[in-house]
Amino acid sequence: MSQRIAILPEIITNKIAAGEVVERPASVIKELIENSLDAGATDISVEIAAGGRRLIRITDNGHGMSREDALLSLERHATSKIRSDNDLDGIHTLGFRGEALPSVASVSRLRLSSRETDSPEGTEIIVEGGKVRDVRACGMAPGTVISVEQIFFNTPARLKFLRSAETEAGHVGDCLTRMAISRPDVAFSCSSDGRDLLRVQRGDLLRRLSQALGKGTAASLHELHLSRDGIDISGYISSPAACRSTTSAMFTYINGRFIRDKVIQHAIMQAYRGVMDRGRYPVVALFIQLPPAEVDVNVHPTKHEVRFRRQSLVHDTLQSALEELLKRSPWLPRPQTPVQPAAVGAPSISQAYRERVAAAAQASLAMARKPDPPRFHETARPQPDPRHTPGTESVSVREAPTPFLPREPAADPQGYFSALRIIGQFHDEYILCQSGDQLVIIDQHAASERVAFQKLRHQFDTDGVESQRLLFPETLELSFSEADTARRFGNELARIGFELEPFGGNTVIVSAIPRLAIARDASGLIRDLLAELTQLGASSAFLDSRDALLSRIACHSVVRGVHRLEERQIRELLHGMDGTDFAASCPHGRPVSHVITLGELERIFKRT
């Protein structure tokens, strides 16, 4: 016989609500900091112990609460921010449900101390597992202090799902970074077991981004402003060259609230398409302001997801704002210092590829020009027209290079790739070859990446990845989470060829990098590896994650995008491919080559 329906006790409903709002220590900190910001705080201090499992303490200088309000704040759905259902259409605060504090109190031992500015004394309330144990007067500065101890002490099922103290501290750091970027007018500090995780002073947004993400990252950002159709968009976005391997540096805010929204992310990625490699993500700090009635923030317990009333308008306006800035390519030299073509005879290219050509120009011009017959013999190609303006350039189609004569057959047996007859390059990105009645198209970046990965893997399995000390060590300023990862995984980074030395705060000195990557962007490679290590988890799993890290190094060690190759270089690459395992794909799983048969071509041209 089924049990009868009964109303759950309040202590159980509070625990259920806590399961929706309080996922881990970082979510506790998010909810409490939002309350501090709503209370007008301009200085917020966070202290955690054991990643927040043992202690979370938040101190602010906000308006504070009276004795009556402090007690009411521990009741479910008690709030000062809304009074009627009409207020839900005009929410201007970060919190409004009145759920966070009672939910946190129900699964922890909580101590709340608060004092209003004009009050002679404060109020201290001690709560254990949702039950008020003591209420008394206390002496304190104006503001509020909330201490949360032994989170989930009465819900062991939730406690066992928490990660290590270091991992939880990392989540806390990420949360504070998002909050700090949202309010550059507020000072934030955070310590973990007595060690500073974050300390930022009040200032403008660019200064805050420099403090939170590092000066190098901030230097790659470009300011954005647009007002259209009742939507205000402002913030900073990075050049395509400063992109990351994850979305961890994409900070998007709606009316001051950090969100993760597929519509917003899609608009950003659409704007960057064609100027950024696949699988890469820009650094952005974007603030979108629109009337509160145009967005519903009451659709998810964590408020990270929202619903727009005019979704398409928000998407298209944001994409348009980003594209207008990207089209101007502010990271490139201005007209008085025109960008030189990557090589003699380079074709006219669209604005979308201008940045990629400029990045490859220096490396291309530095290549040796010694005669090494047979060389590519190509017909003359049009030069870029400096009169073309951004957005109006057309894409020129290259004329097919005249194929050179094949070499004399080698005495030793050749592998598949070495035996291919080279036709030439297409768009300086793909190698065209012939094998019998087949046209073989090879992605030169994917092939180079596979060869480099094979070398790194062999080095790792024998004497370790070959390292090269830098003649001039680089100083690299990291975000606090990146610095924490570098500290925790120092031994693992050394095994793959890196030497990083602490230099105070979140700054490290790069003394050595893998020899294969010596000519590449060391700082970008290190940031990508730190992001990869953060996602992969504990160092005990390092051997399992070895290939992912080595493939990241391989990707950075070879040419990307448009790059002119001589015949000698192509033959060396093809020979290297014959000596690799899994030569059909790059380490990330993308295909290296594609075959088009003569029969397929004849069908395309209706000759069969």
UniProtKB/Swiss-Prot annotation:
One GO term of the biological process aspect: mismatch repair
Organism encoding this protein: Pelobacter propionicus (strain DSM 2379 / NBRC 103807 / OttBd1)
Family to which the UniProt record says this protein belongs: Belongs to the DNA mismatch repair MutL/HexB family.
UniProt-recorded name of the protein: DNA mismatch repair protein MutL
Keyword tags: DNA damage, DNA repair
GO cellular component terms, semicolon-separated: mismatch repair complex
Role noted for this protein: This protein is involved in the repair of mismatches in DNA. It is required for dam-dependent methyl-directed DNA mismatch repair. May act as a 'molecular matchmaker', a protein that promotes the formation of a stable complex between two or more DNA-binding proteins in an ATP-dependent manner without itself being part of a final effector complex.
Entry-linked Pfam families: DNA_mis_repair, HATPase_c_3, MutL_C
GO molecular function, one term: ATP binding
Ranges of biased composition (kind: Basic and acidic residues): 369-390
Domain of life: Bacteria
Cross-referenced SMART domains: DNA_mis_repair, MutL_C
Cystines in this chain: none
Region ranges (Disordered): 363-397
